């Protein structure tokens, strides 16, 4: 029970505790616990949900597109610990105190829905996806059998089928996963199982030295997956890229031949469509030719760039993707389906996913059920409990239609082009390279460095600029923008356009604000 001091402000819905406890005459007790009736106060709970939803609407949804609001209310960790009541006590907190905590959580959280949040490969607020998330949180389903999740399994099937069509396959299979990293791990394991099915039961002891190949610009999840699966990071061969960050096919084939010469067993090539930093797209047709010649599984990590498939204008970036054996595609990025919404799509239609991952749990996947058990898809996943993530994307797709999703991609890339043109016009801004996608990489050169020769001292000083500007913008709360060093290049900004709430004015503001924050450096 809460202390008297906690209950100075009574809340509607509070009831006399005596009303919740049955009289001793009628009470049924087991181990001293009264079992009569529910012990939750439904009225108080419903009122709390209603008030919390109102708070979310007022403080999150209605402010999501307001550029006058801060992107973040920065506090260092130790200070934030003092500002938030993080302690969990023996007695519960009253509803009004919980609402205060909710307000604090919103206030000090980064507003990723803000039009000037450019920090990651996700951003913005899709209202339809948000409602879908409210629904799934309230329903609390787990997507593994049709009996407990009939609607969401059918939705997932419909969404996967449509995504497979956009890749260009006539048929296929797939599953939604908690992140593109997991999709890449699934694909790596699936390729290994296809190459050496005995590994599932007999393990690695009798297997050859398996080797996989991926771009030097690949996502770091490839190394993590190799480590997690016992393949080993030393058996990940990184293929050199050209000046734009694309895998060089000739270098790939050289490495494949070298691995065979050393007695290793190549089994997988992972190409990337939309690299994390530069936004590069590997030449899929040429890579697929090599995979066919050497009987290698081709996986395409299109977690970031896959959404370009929705655009008739930009889908050429992924030319040849139909030749892949598997594809990772994250609708929660460019298509704003809400984190997490990530699919692994597989060309194989012989139940390879189920063969690779099934454990045939008898308490879940009984074969004598009264309905078609082919809809029980849980054995295609390494998870048991699994969220209905496809529903978020389905709701957005239903609301906007394919043409609306196409317009979302086209507009984001048009805004990117506008920003590139503005960078070229402005003194003190320098593009790293012409972008291929929505990743705009550039340096800001403050006035104090503009007359310096581009030698070691210049680059050493420029390396300090982006982190210092990032600190200032975070503490001011005016915008958020990512930066990084990359393959020998000193720290530069990476700006990504995603949200349809972003305008031309926001692009202009971004450049103006960087100049304002950095001109005295």
Curated annotation (Swiss-Prot):
The modification N6-(pyridoxal phosphate)lysine is found at residue 333. Gene3D superfamilies: 3.90.1150.170, Type I PLP-dependent aspartate aminotransferase-like (Major domain). One of its GO terms (biological process) is carboxylic acid metabolic process. It catalyses: L-aspartate + H(+) = beta-alanine + CO2; 3-sulfino-L-alanine + H(+) = hypotaurine + CO2; L-cysteate + H(+) = taurine + CO2. Keywords: Decarboxylase, Lyase, Pyridoxal phosphate. Expressed very weakly in neurons and not detected in astrocytes, brain or liver. The keyword ATP-binding does not apply. InterPro entries: PyrdxlP-dep_de-COase, PyrdxlP-dep_Trfase, PyrdxlP-dep_Trfase_major, Pyridoxal-P_BS. One of its GO terms (cellular component) is cytoplasm. Pfam families: Pyridoxal_deC. GO terms for molecular function: aspartate 1-decarboxylase activity; carboxy-lyase activity; pyridoxal phosphate binding; sulfinoalanine decarboxylase activity. It is an enzyme of class 4 (lyase). Its EC number is 4.1.1.11, 4.1.1.29. Homodimer. Belongs to the group II decarboxylase family. May catalyze the decarboxylation of L-aspartate, 3-sulfino-L-alanine (cysteine sulfinic acid), and L-cysteate to beta-alanine, hypotaurine and taurine, respectively. Does not exhibit any decarboxylation activity toward glutamate. PANTHER family: ACIDIC AMINO ACID DECARBOXYLASE GADL1, GLUTAMATE DECARBOXYLASE-RELATED. This is Acidic amino acid decarboxylase GADL1. The gene is GADL1.
